Amino acid sequence: MLSKYELIKPDIGSSHGNITKVYEIVGGKPLRGQVKVSGSKNAALPVLAASLLCKEPLQLTNLPKILDVTNMIQCMEALGKRFEFINTNTIKIGNREMDTLTIPKEAARQIRASIILLGPLVAQYPKVILPLPGGCSIGKRPIDLHISALNALGVDIVELPDCLVCSRRYARLQGNTINFSIKTVTGTENAMMAAVLAEGTTIINNAAMEPEIVDLANFLNRLGAKINGGGSDRITISGVDKLNSCGSYSIMADRIEAGTYLVAAAMTRGSISVKGVNPDYLVAVLSELKCAGAKITCDSDSIQLDMGEEYGESLNITTKPYPGFPTDLQSLFLSLTCVLRGNSYLCETLFEDRFQIVQELKKMGANISLKDNTAHIKGVSRLRGSQVNATDLRSGAALVCASLAAEGITQIFAIEHIERGYEDLILKLKALGANIKLIENTHVTSTELSDSHFKEATSSETRIQRASLIETIVTPSITTFGQFKRVPTGEVTELEKQQTPYLHHIM
């Protein structure tokens, strides 16, 4: 087997006993130069999942070299896919025969996006058992919307404490109308991937409108799907019998990574050009950067930012589904508002725990108070270096930006969160003039550095991971467990255990 997903596995920052990896950043130097954006994490993961629907070889290019992609590949290899890397960012995907399809539990529990394997799996197999996903600890991200959408297409689902047990009612999924009560990106993606092989027509109302949805629709249509309306709030899908190879497909650029470098340049009073990104996907973000004092100019595939010598006035931001301000950049702009003049307000409407970063920024001298889902920030003249912990992917990136602007030295721990979603972060920042390095074998434990807030965050993540210690199996038999309902483990019948051989291991 020529699969070498370790080629895209980055050096991750983690703690093993007394050995810790950290980012060390000396702040105060403006970022200047050009940076090219990598392929989008949030587009690559659903496109990889969608490749399960095609039994013919195909090739993906512009695949980001990040840990989430590595974990997704590990999951998909266990589901019968064969991966061969042509180069670091290009992968050839094929198939191999499998007697038992079992996802490695370690990979499944590390990645929130494992939930989007459900759509393509139930489209092809009569029964699927999927572990509840892991990922960043940023609050509740209920999967009820995924379940209700698949239920509408003919999937009966029982949610156990550790997994979902899914059974098709019919030999083939049935097209239907899906009405999402709120917008959900991964829920929309799951519904799309399931519906492309369903019998009849599926209409998704209140669909997510993100550019990554458009990218997935484009990929599926290249495979022979019939999807109309991707990028609007109403998507129509006419089911087909099978999908065929498109040859090669290029993953779209990462607009969140682009926003990250723009914020870093703004915070350091720098001047950079971000290449390879469509500025139309960042309209709300660029508007706020202009309000913060940045001069912005755009070409068709690049964005130039010049911050000048002075920070701008305060911001008032509310996160919203696309095309509104993205929640994935909320933490970054929280860092930015710490150094702006005046009082800023940041309201988070999508995730209740996006403010875990506040305690870390306070260590650096930030003046932030929280009330409900809103942060009130009073700008300070300068942040100062400290020892901080990345509690999730985007907060980690935000701490990097804050450290680049701070006076003195900052050490960032738990950098494995950052490496989940950023390709070659250190190399790209160094090319812009940043003083940043990875320090290994530092004999300091995270416990010695963390406060009670971080302990709660890490213990919460541990509980999430512990709850996901179950592998995923696809079995050949059809078993109906009834309509979706939550049931305690003890209510699963002996017959259901026998029909799903793996279930008895988790009872």
From Swiss-Prot:
Q: Which UniProt keywords apply?
A: Cell cycle, Cell division, Cell shape, Cell wall biogenesis/degradation, Cytoplasm, Peptidoglycan synthesis, Pyruvate, Transferase
Gene Ontology annotations of biological process type? cell division; cell wall organization; peptidoglycan biosynthetic process; regulation of cell shape; UDP-N-acetylgalactosamine biosynthetic process
Q: In which pathway does it act?
A: Cell wall biogenesis; peptidoglycan biosynthesis
Q: Where's it mainly located?
A: cytoplasm
| Gene3D superfamilies with a match to the protein in the record | Enolpyruvate transferase domain
CC annotations in GO? cytoplasm
- Catalysed conversion reaction: phosphoenolpyruvate + UDP-N-acetyl-alpha-D-glucosamine = UDP-N-acetyl-3-O-(1-carboxyvinyl)-alpha-D-glucosamine + phosphate
A GO molecular function held by the record: UDP-N-acetylglucosamine 1-carboxyvinyltransferase activity
Top-rank taxon, per record: Bacteria
Give one Pfam family, short name only.
EPSP_synthase
2-(S-cysteinyl)pyruvic acid O-phosphothioketal is found on C136
- Report residues binding phosphoenolpyruvate: K41, N42
Disulfide pattern: none
Which positions are catalytic residues?
A: C136
Family to which the UniProt record says this protein belongs: Belongs to the EPSP synthase family. MurA subfamily.
State what protein this is by name: UDP-N-acetylglucosamine 1-carboxyvinyltransferase 1
Q: Which organism is it from?
A: Legionella pneumophila (strain Lens)
The organism's lineage? Bacteria, Pseudomonadati, Pseudomonadota, Gammaproteobacteria, Legionellales
Q: Which gene encodes it?
A: murA1
